[in-house]
């Protein structure tokens, strides 16, 4: 999935409806992307693993400790980061949307290769997602 659909949605909504963008990258080599982000999303909180692009840290470091009312978080990234995001906002999980990545052999739900555990039973990322609320994913049962 990656960040492209989320950035597209943010641009379409306009910054009047987007409270902020927090982005994490690996480090060197992402300078061009970082410049585009700064131009496209003024005030973007940019983080990198080594501090060479933006501030040293992760995208989670750019988020508030508590979600303001009527605010949603849209996120994509490594499973560990999404798990940490769900843990950061345990009582607001319904307002945290996570775009999950999974190997999808058939892409139509038949092979069950992309199944994840949720509060509503096993769900297929390819046809039931890829976006889920953070509260519905059973992160402790999710294989790394």
Placement of each model-derived feature along the sequence:
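Short microdomains enriched in Cys/His and/or Lys/Arg
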Residues: 127-144
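A generic "cationic amphipathic patch" detector
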Residues: 34, 86, 124-127, 139
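FNR/FR-type flavoprotein reductase catalytic core
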Residues: 1-101
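Low-complexity, flexible helical/coil segments
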Residues: 31-35, 55-61, 108-114, 131-136
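Local cysteine-cluster metal-coordination motifs and their immediate loop/turn environment
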Residues: 3-8, 79-81, 101-131
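Short secondary-structure transition/capping segments
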Residues: 70, 96, 121-122, 143-144
